[in-house]
Amino acid sequence: GWLTEFLPDETVLDYIEQADQILVKFGATTERFQPSNELKKRCLEYDLHMSQAQLKHLGTDSNFETMKKLIHALAERVEIHTGADVVGVDRESHILTVKTAEGEQAVEAGKIIFAVGRAGSRFFSAWCEENDIPLHNNQVDVGVRVELPSMVWEDFAKKIYEPKIRYRSKGYGDIIRMFCFNDRGQVVTENTNGVLTVNGHAYRDEARKTQNSNF
């Protein structure tokens, strides 16, 4: 993301640490992978540029359990409604129109936070246009999911877990990068409102690991 364009680096790192402490409180791992100058140097020998950062591997399965505990804790203090679509937001009155299986209902809120994700991007874009809020498009990357035998990435997975590597193509100067690495994970198809995409999952449970890694 581009959060550091709006906040100082130190503030962003502080928020990341706060978020991590919350996740750990609800069962997330405390293990951190440290940067490796050795692997960075190996990449540079082939004109590959690897980002350096502390990383954690939560795991799809382990993260699901962490989220369940977090939601149960939140439910003791706030109301959580699922299976409900927000179909309208009045900017002046702060009244939301929510559609459920029983029909539409109005909900008034002091403050409203839009967190629409990919599935709600069209709704949010239309709402911004209706309320004369200017929009601009971010860069869109064209991606493929690559799967290789896990032994190819074994050194990286054991030392830093997730390599984030960039390469500038010689022909056209395009930036090619890898991200969302899954050590001995699974490649899956996801359907978001009829749009099919390919994603990867990695698990902490050894029994669910495969012989391949993907990114």
Locate the predicted segments by residue.
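Residues forming the flavin
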Residues: 1-11, 31-215
